[in-house]
Amino acid sequence: MKASMFLALAGLVLLFVVGYASESEEKDFPRELLSKIFAVDDFKGEERGCKGFGDSCTPGKNECCPNYACSSKHKWCKVYLGK
Protein backbone atom coordinates (compact mmCIF):
# COMPACT_ATOMS: atom_id res chain seq x y z
CA MET A 1 0.00 0.00 0.00
CA LYS A 2 2.81 2.42 0.89
CA ALA A 3 4.68 1.57 -2.30
CA SER A 4 1.65 2.19 -4.49
CA MET A 5 1.02 5.55 -2.80
CA PHE A 6 4.65 6.51 -3.31
CA LEU A 7 4.52 5.53 -7.00
CA ALA A 8 1.30 7.49 -7.49
CA LEU A 9 2.82 10.56 -5.84
CA ALA A 10 6.02 10.21 -7.89
CA GLY A 11 3.91 9.93 -11.05
CA LEU A 12 2.00 13.09 -10.19
CA VAL A 13 5.22 14.98 -9.52
CA LEU A 14 6.67 13.79 -12.82
CA LEU A 15 3.47 14.78 -14.63
CA PHE A 16 3.63 18.24 -13.02
CA VAL A 17 7.27 18.72 -14.04
CA VAL A 18 6.64 17.62 -17.62
CA GLY A 19 3.55 19.83 -17.86
CA TYR A 20 5.42 22.82 -16.49
CA ALA A 21 8.33 22.19 -18.83
CA SER A 22 6.09 21.98 -21.88
CA GLU A 23 4.42 25.30 -21.04
CA SER A 24 7.73 27.01 -20.37
CA GLU A 25 8.82 29.56 -22.95
CA GLU A 26 12.39 28.32 -22.80
CA LYS A 27 12.84 25.44 -25.21
CA ASP A 28 15.95 24.19 -23.42
CA PHE A 29 14.23 23.86 -20.04
CA PRO A 30 13.24 20.15 -20.29
CA ARG A 31 16.69 19.18 -21.51
CA GLU A 32 18.34 21.31 -18.83
CA LEU A 33 16.09 19.88 -16.11
CA LEU A 34 16.79 16.29 -17.12
CA SER A 35 20.52 16.91 -17.34
CA LYS A 36 20.53 18.35 -13.81
CA ILE A 37 18.48 15.45 -12.46
CA PHE A 38 20.69 12.79 -14.02
CA ALA A 39 24.05 14.60 -13.66
CA VAL A 40 25.65 12.08 -11.34
CA ASP A 41 29.06 11.89 -12.98
CA ASP A 42 29.71 15.64 -12.85
CA PHE A 43 31.27 15.37 -9.42
CA LYS A 44 33.55 12.51 -10.47
CA GLY A 45 35.16 14.67 -13.16
CA GLU A 46 36.59 17.11 -10.64
CA GLU A 47 39.90 15.93 -9.28
CA ARG A 48 41.54 17.18 -6.14
CA GLY A 49 45.24 17.62 -5.64
CA CYS A 50 45.00 15.70 -2.38
CA LYS A 51 43.25 12.61 -1.11
CA GLY A 52 40.32 12.77 1.29
CA PHE A 53 39.05 10.57 4.09
CA GLY A 54 39.19 6.86 3.26
CA ASP A 55 41.24 7.22 0.07
CA SER A 56 44.17 4.85 -0.32
CA CYS A 57 47.61 6.39 0.16
CA THR A 58 51.29 5.56 0.53
CA PRO A 59 52.77 6.20 3.98
CA GLY A 60 55.61 8.71 3.92
CA LYS A 61 54.27 10.65 0.92
CA ASN A 62 52.22 13.77 1.59
CA GLU A 63 49.17 12.73 -0.48
CA CYS A 64 46.36 13.37 2.00
CA CYS A 65 44.47 16.66 2.27
CA PRO A 66 45.15 19.02 5.18
CA ASN A 67 43.92 17.67 8.55
CA TYR A 68 44.32 14.10 7.26
CA ALA A 69 47.26 11.73 7.63
CA CYS A 70 48.13 8.48 5.88
CA SER A 71 47.76 5.57 8.27
CA SER A 72 50.80 3.30 8.09
CA LYS A 73 48.72 0.42 9.42
CA HIS A 74 45.67 0.67 7.13
CA LYS A 75 47.23 2.62 4.20
CA TRP A 76 44.34 5.08 3.83
CA CYS A 77 43.84 8.74 4.77
CA LYS A 78 42.22 9.36 8.13
CA VAL A 79 41.71 12.35 10.41
CA TYR A 80 44.94 13.64 11.94
CA LEU A 81 44.35 14.44 15.61
CA GLY A 82 47.87 15.65 16.39
CA LYS A 83 50.55 14.26 18.65
UniProtKB/Swiss-Prot annotation:
Subcellular location per the Swiss-Prot or TrEMBL entry:
Secreted
- Per UniProt, what is one Pfam family of this protein? Toxin_12
Q: List the disulfide bonds.
A: 50-65, 57-70, 64-77
User: What would you give as a GO molecular function for this chain, any one?
Assistant: toxin activity
InterPro entries with a match to the protein in the record: Huwentoxin-1, Huwentoxin_CS1
Q: Which GO terms describe its cellular component?
A: extracellular region; host cell presynaptic membrane
Cited SUPFAM superfamilies: omega toxin-like (SSF57059)
Q: Check the record and name the PROSITE patterns matching this protein.
A: HWTX_1
The entry's function note states:
Selective antagonist of neuronal tetrodotoxin (TTX)-sensitive voltage-gated sodium channels (IC(50)=1270 nM on Nav1.1/SCN1A, 270 nM on Nav1.2/SCN2A, 491 nM on Nav1.3/SCN3A and 232 nM on Nav1.7/SCN9A). This toxin suppress Nav1.7 current amplitude without significantly altering the activation, inactivation, and repriming kinetics. Short extreme depolarizations partially activate the toxin-bound channel, indicating voltage-dependent inhibition of this toxin. This toxin increases the deactivation of the Nav1.7 current after extreme depolarizations.
Assembly, per entry: Monomer.
What else the UniProt entry mentions is: Negative results: has no activity on Nav1.4, Nav1.5, Nav1.8 and Nav1.9 sodium and calcium currents.
Q: What is this protein called?
A: Hainantoxin-III 11
Q: Which organism is it from?
A: Cyriopagopus hainanus
